[in-house]
Amino acid sequence: MASLTFGYSTLADRLENIQVPSLDSHPDWDVLITVQSGTAEMPSAEQLAKAPKGDRIQVLAFPGKGVTKLRNQVLANAKGDYLIFADDDVTFDSVGLQDAIEEMQSAELTLALGQAVNETGKLRKKYPVKPVRLNKLNSAKAATYEMIVNTKKVQASGVLFDESFGAGASETYLGDEYIFISDLVTKGLNCYFIPVTFATHPTQSSGSGWGTEQDRKARAKIFDRVFRGNRTLPYLVRVGFGAKKLGKGLTLKNFLLFIFKR
């Protein structure tokens, strides 16, 4: 059976929130926890003592902040044939993960994007009802804990998370998952959405809000990065994405500002 690494990334003061999956009945599963202090200093021994413990749980500590830096450490150090990225407030569906890995093996996928439910068991957003090949237009709503990758294929591709984006970045604190998938797609790698539930995650998240100036500018810059090298497409794509949010937290004025990154 293929092995799987659960790759967590968090800040030191949130370590105790992590609920690792049961490894007892899965000898080929392991847990890798990457943790940052949020400051120039390393996490303290007292903070690290709150991390989950076990024979197949590894903790790697770093100074500073920036979740994409930690995701890249997860990519570099994962031992499993497959890797699922994890936040400190997510719990996983073991059966769904096993089904996903079998499908990834059968279809020779580099990345599978799956579903997640909220605390009540309701799907967190609208998902396709059948497998769909991912591209730069249909993967913008991806969440970290919805992604499983073939570890060796991604490592061989050289694709990493863009460390200018994601939680901890001063301005562009969103979009790192979307950019990661887009870079894999650009490389011609096999990336699909599959209608399988991977995890449970709280309803509110860093990607839930629209409308503030900071949020609007952060989202606008994501499309420049995804479609870099093309001067027109980022504007057209912002029109399409922004239009869907009109009246749903995005005013007409802010819609126009979003298009032009104002």
Question: Where do the model's predicted regions map?
Answer:
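Short aromatic/hydrophobic "clamp" motif used to bind/position activated sugar donors
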Residues: L83
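A short, conserved alpha-helix in the catalytic core of glycosyltransferases
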Residues: M147, K153-V154, S164-I194
